Amino acid sequence: MILSFTSCKQITRQVQSPVTIGTIEYQGYGATLDAQSVMSMINLAAAYESMTLSDTVYTKVEGKIKEVCSKKGCWMTLDMGSGNDIMVRFKDYSFFMPLDAEGAVIVSGKAFVSETSVDDLKHYAEDAGATQAAIEAIVSPKKTYTFEAVGVLLAI
């Protein structure tokens, strides 16, 4: 059964049994994934640079978690290594990540460029534990590299 939420008020974790790929053990969340045909972060970063707001790329990419929503695990950011991050949300809020998730992940879904509203930026800053002054300093929307994941493999 899949539950769908429109905010990070409820927690649903679709967790699979751990799997070993090569020498790395992964815990799966959301849709079941394999580690075949995984795009490098360098190639995804290059793809993002050429994308417009209407473009979408369906892919799997390996990356490193930079931050996870500290309230519910309803989003995470991945480090692109170029000073930019990827905002990862989970399709239909059907699963969330552990609050203490860190390290390597493989995410599967769609990559696209979006514009994040001031309200959403403030919400994410609040979830990340930003100060009130930092939240109030957010006054304009931001071009965001976004990924809507249907499944995640978290290295454990």
What are these regions (language model features)?
Residues 8-156:
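OB-fold and OB-like single-stranded nucleic-acid-recognition modules
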Residues 3-7:
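C-terminal motif of bacterial Sec signal peptides marking the signal peptidase cleavage site
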